[in-house]
Amino acid sequence: MRRLLLAGILRRASSSPSSHHHLHLVRALSASSPLPASDADLRKYAGYALLLLGCGAATYYSFPLPPDALHKKAVPFKYAPLPDDLHAVSNWSATHEVHTRVLLQPDSLPALHDALAAAHGECRKLRPLGSGLSPNGLALSRAGMVNLALMDKVLGVDAKKKTVTVQAGIRVAELVDALREHGLTLQNFASIREQQVGGIIQVGAHGTGARLPPIDEQVISMKLVTPAKGTIELSREKDPDLFYLARCGLGGLGVVAEVTLQCVERHQLIEHTFVSNADEVKKNHKKWLSENKHIKYLWIPYTDTVVVVQCNPPSRWRTPKFTSKYGKDEAIQHVRDLYHESLKKYRTKAESNDPEVDQLSFTELRDRLLTLDPLDKDHVIRINKAEAEYWKKSEGYRMGWSDEILGFDCGGQQWVSETCFPAGTLAKPNMKDLDYIEELLQLIEKEDIPAPAPIEQRWTACSRSPMSPASSSQEDDIFSWVGIIMYLPTSDARQRKEITEEFFNYRSKTQTNLWDGYSAYEHWAKIEVPKDKDELAELQARLRKRFPVDAYNKARMELDPNKVLSNAKLEKLFPVTEVQHEK
């Protein structure tokens, strides 16, 4: 660099009037004859100064700064588009995402069989994806996935036995529509109906109703396509142990290709929604659990409000009044007012005149409100109180088909942790379900957690699937399911990161203070794998206390010895030792 600069100076010097003067200076700098120490130092530092000035001049003229540079807006960095062969797959809350070059969509049982056989032979990953809705991204794998969206046919309906056989890629909503003409429907539903049937049974999904088991209990038989043993048929009669294990198999034992489900007659329900409080709930809890076919509580933190939702078949002897005291606009107007007030506080008056606000649903308004300051406890409390008032003004009845009534608007993108724990029997509820909630609400207030509403509490009967969180050999056992949430109402990466950190702090405190005391275990679609090695070891040991991990891993090694169906989450939850693998 120095030689180049000297050459440039020489060229400029030769063309200038004072070329001789500069030439002598350069010669002096480059001379090799010995000089006195002080003279040599002087010329050395003079050379450094010239070098610095030359570099600055070269930089200035090579990369000129535009005159309006100080007034230009920063342009955000834009990622290049993904290659055509790279698929981005995320769950519905966009909390987990992978990019993969292998996303297969077989359209038949033979095609699925061949795909798994090839992956097994080449030791490649091919994780069953389902609809990919699980909040924890349980089905995601960047190494490769298989989706059964093209295997979505109804294969047969037996109206007398009230059963239906379907390909596992059919969505719940599509299945319900297909069953309608036969006068049938499913026994129970989860909150949303976009799941594929194969996925909804594999993760132990559930609805609500202390007499109704999780959805995997509706499975009578199924065809499981495995990497090592091909397609196998399982039922209560054919290999019952593996059948019950595979019903809630987390996609680790095989890809569920076909399922026969027990249905019920299509029926209507009357939903009664009303607001209560903790004391009233305690007085009536046992009676409500036994009397109502479907029931759930929506607890609102920092208030004494409990929203009770009861659903039952219509009674010919009693017709409820369906008229409500308030219209939809009246019920939600105070939430709109809070939004306008909050905009003035956090933004400008101009934005408070947004005409779109009047078209937003309650859950959309709640998201808008939370976006303003999602982690400010006082702001969240104001929103929770507005929600309590909204439900008070929304009390009343509505009637519809069961699949319509049992759906629930969960709100926008969110983090969620749902635990399941025993609650006694239907004849003798132990009331620990209400104790759990009481402790949880006290913990939230003690720790100043900006916990939004609702905390949803539901119940189910037990399941005979040993990997189900509601698994029990006692037929009359009931289980309570409690979900805590934090919404992700914004696309701002920094804000989402802050909400995520606060949510995991919230979840950690509930785990430390509540889970062991109530034998609570997380829903498989909502369990998160800790990054800390010690915490992971504790989780693995804890899972072994509740679930038949050795039997599950043994079946995995028999049906999938090359771990084609596994992903990082499954491997961390259920690590297979070398000894187990060799066996």
Swiss-Prot record:
GO terms for biological process: L-ascorbic acid biosynthetic process. It catalyses: L-galactono-1,4-lactone + 4 Fe(III)-[cytochrome c] = L-dehydroascorbate + 4 Fe(II)-[cytochrome c] + 5 H(+). It is found in: Mitochondrion membrane. Pathway: Cofactor biosynthesis; L-ascorbate biosynthesis. Keywords: Membrane, Mitochondrion, Oxidoreductase, Transit peptide, Transmembrane, Transmembrane helix. GO terms for molecular function: D-arabinono-1,4-lactone oxidase activity; FAD binding; galactonolactone dehydrogenase activity; oxidoreductase activity. Residues 1-36 form a transit peptide. Signal peptide: none annotated. The chain crosses the membrane at residues 45-61. Residues 37-78 form a propeptide. The keyword Transit peptide applies. GO terms for cellular component: mitochondrial membrane. It is a single-pass membrane protein. Its EC number is 1.3.2.3. NCBIfam families: GLDHase. Involved in the biosynthesis of ascorbic acid. This is L-galactono-1,4-lactone dehydrogenase 1, mitochondrial. It comes from Oryza sativa subsp. japonica. The gene is GLDH1.
